[in-house]
């Protein structure tokens, strides 16, 4: 395990890289490698980068601020689950946010369950909630993204879950094209930043990035442990309490996801309406 000073140097390098490359796509593959290296090494830093931040709600923007289950949590660095509920801090097309909670590649730590403090996310017109991870474009090509696929499910009791029947169409090799990952999260880069690029609800749900999910989608309820037609109807009519985010390969082990893309980094989840 590396010294904390090494981690701080890496973070400084990240900051410098962002400053120089903010509006370009050159060397994005190097950024992917540096992001992975930093997250791999930053296991026990003394200070969490997220501990003093909090999510900002407004009409039509309701952050999941309740941590129900986060087995990968250690309280430090990218293993601080507070980073998943302290507000979304996206960095645009070419940069992955460091304000994230990294999931494990196996076991209970490969999942994160969040809630809205007893309120239910409602079925509205269009997208009902957005999952924000930290993907970014590689080589200036929107069809080549550093992505870490996430399977999204919702529930009321932490036992029975309904999902969106995610499907991979990329064949036997790992694809960096988001179009090959249907109904997964962790695909779309994030423009919304509650501090540097705030938006109202309409803008956020149309152009803020992240991956949106709709309870009215025809695929909703076609996957998930314990999901039934009755449970799906209940979610659609009355809403849900919890959202569960899981590293895709844990649920679908046949997916050709390499090690560098196995453990997603969660920036947050935002709902359009809660009650």
Which stretches of residues belong to each language-model region?
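Bacterial Sec-dependent N-terminal signal peptides
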Residues: 4, 15-56
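Sec-dependent signal peptide recognition
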Residues: 2-11
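A domain-level signal for the mature, folded cores of soluble proteins
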Residues: 43-150, 166-275
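Surface-exposed loop/edge segments in extracytoplasmic proteins
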Residues: 158-165
